[in-house]
Structure formats: C-alpha cells, structure tokens
Amino acid sequence: MNAPHTPHLNEAEAAAAVEANAAELGRRALTRREQKEAYENNKLFKRLVRQVGQAIGDYNMIEHGDKVMVCLSGGKDSYALLDILLRLRERAPIDFDIVAVNLDQKQPGFPEHVLPEYLTKIGVPFHIENQDTYSIVKRLVPEGKTTCSLCSRLRRGILYRVAGELGATKIALGHHRDDIVQTLLLNMFYGGKLKGMPPKLQSDDGKNIVIRPLAYAKETDLEKYAELREFPIIPCNLCGSQPNLKRAEMKALIRDWDKRFPGRVDNMFNALANVVPSHLMDARLFPFAGLRATGEADPNGDIAFDEDPCGTDASAPGGAKSVSIVQFDDL
C-alpha cells in the first residue's frame, strides 16, 4: 500500500508519517536489513521443507496410514525434524500420525519438564519413557572412557520396544547429511569398509523400519533453523561423558572442506547414491570371478588406459527420475 503524496512534508515528518502508517497496520515498518533477514529465513524454511519432502518421497519413508514415532532428544536436529514433519503433514496428500517420544535416561541435571511443556504447548501427542540407563552405563564403563556406544545400544533397544507398544510403523531419527558423511568417513578411516548411514532401513531386530527424513539437510541449516524457531534446546553432555573424538574430528574436517572446497562434501554425499560395484573390489557385489569378455560393448566396462573423468556436478540422491509419493504444494 503506497502512502499518499505529501510534497510539503520534510524528511522527518515523512518518516513519522511512514511510522504512523505502519502502526495503523498493526506493525512497525521493517528496515532493509530486517527485510533481507526475513527473506533469507523464508528461503531457509522452504529449503528444509523441500529437502525433507524430497527425501521422504525418494525413499518412500512415510506411507498412508503410518504412525511415525519421532525420537525427540531435546537437541536441535530432533526438534527440527518434528517441526518440519508437522508442517509437511498439513499439506501432505496422505494421512499419517505423529507421536513424539523421549527417553529420559535419568542423567544428572536433565530438565525433565522441558519436553512435556513444549509438546503440550504445540499440541503433539507424546510419550516419555523413564529408564535409568545412566546408572547402568556408569557402572559398566570405566571412568574417563566414552559411554556413547553402550548408551546408544541401550537406547536403541528401549526405543524399539516402545515403538511396538505404541503401534508405531516408522521410527524417525534426526540424522542429517553431515552425520551421514561423517559415518562414511569413520567407516573408511577406522573400519576399513564403505558403509554410511542409510535414509531408510530395517532395524536389527527385524521388527521396525527406521527413517531419516533430514538426510538431505545440512547441519548449518538446522543450526540456523533452531535459532529462528527458538527451540528449548537441552544440552547433550549432561552425562559427563567424553565426546566421540573420532566423530568430532570428522565433523571438523567436513566443516573445513565445506568452507575451503565448496561442493566437495555434497559430491561425497551424492556418491553414496551413485555406486558402481563393477569398479570397486567387493566380490559379493559383483561377479568378478566369472567375468568373461562378451565381445559386446559395455558402457560400464573398464576404460583401462584412459583417465576416468571426475565430475563435479554429480546428481543428487534419487536423481531426476525419482517419483515421490508425497508431493507438497509450493510454500
């Protein structure tokens, strides 16, 4: 709405008129900087929603009638996961239910009121599972050693059980792109295997389907989103355990690469969805022993003496041909 033309007003009076007009509209006029921030924040929101929606569609993570159990730790990632899934559900062409679950492991200083108050406020069904795994871990793990591995195994088993009790058909975890690449590097550097963190898999007990809807999202975007949404973050080091130093090293490495070599981490992530078994060395994935020359050209055959061209624009996971069962209106 344009203000009426008043040629006799000086600059101060004109500014006052603009402020008064904004007040009449019930809000203060935004500065140019505020307008830019609002624009960037809106882009961030749309990007995250688009990435989560695409991941869900590419891997058929959520289907009609599903009951999705969102594992909520109180960290930025799980808050963002719940928030975005709730927004997507409003526009989804399918019906599915969401229940938030938190495992209270009785860590010293854990603010047990935070999550129930937050979830009640936003109107999301939730379940708090109280299990003193902290005492078990402290009893079994020597002082000074990281407790993360044992704690994770105990937590996983409990959450699988809770999913069955609640009738959940999918278990949603808050792992993102950076977590997936970190896991790939950890397995390569310390485990001697090409293994990442899949966006969808069957649990080791064979009874649950685990999904990671944030698989395409960058951690830096999730950090910014958590700040904008002002989630009541709960610290992740209440147990006093030493952090996983190897994973912290991979995280620092990825952050450094993202700054110094734009696109490198994206290409590493995309490589997980563009695997060529015939050009690796795993005989379980490709029948090297029985390979014979057929006399027919093979586009996937070895180019032998030529240098393999390195692409810098590897297509994203899912590719252009993927068909999403969940499509959302423009936001």
From Swiss-Prot:
Its main location: cytoplasm. SUPFAM superfamilies: Adenine nucleotide alpha hydrolases-like. It is an enzyme of class 2 (transferase). A motif (PP-loop motif) lies at residues 73-78. It catalyses: cytidine(32) in tRNA + S-sulfanyl-L-cysteinyl-[cysteine desulfurase] + AH2 + ATP = 2-thiocytidine(32) in tRNA + L-cysteinyl-[cysteine desulfurase] + A + AMP + diphosphate + H(+). GO terms for cellular component: cytoplasm. Keywords: 4Fe-4S, ATP-binding, Cytoplasm, Iron, Iron-sulfur, Magnesium, Metal-binding, Nucleotide-binding, RNA-binding, Transferase, tRNA processing, tRNA-binding. The thiolation reaction likely consists of two steps: a first activation step by ATP to form an adenylated intermediate of the target base of tRNA, and a second nucleophilic substitution step of the sulfur (S) atom supplied by the hydrosulfide attached to the Fe-S cluster. This is tRNA-cytidine(32) 2-sulfurtransferase. It comes from Burkholderia mallei (strain ATCC 23344). The lineage of its organism: Bacteria, Pseudomonadati, Pseudomonadota, Betaproteobacteria, Burkholderiales. The gene is ttcA.
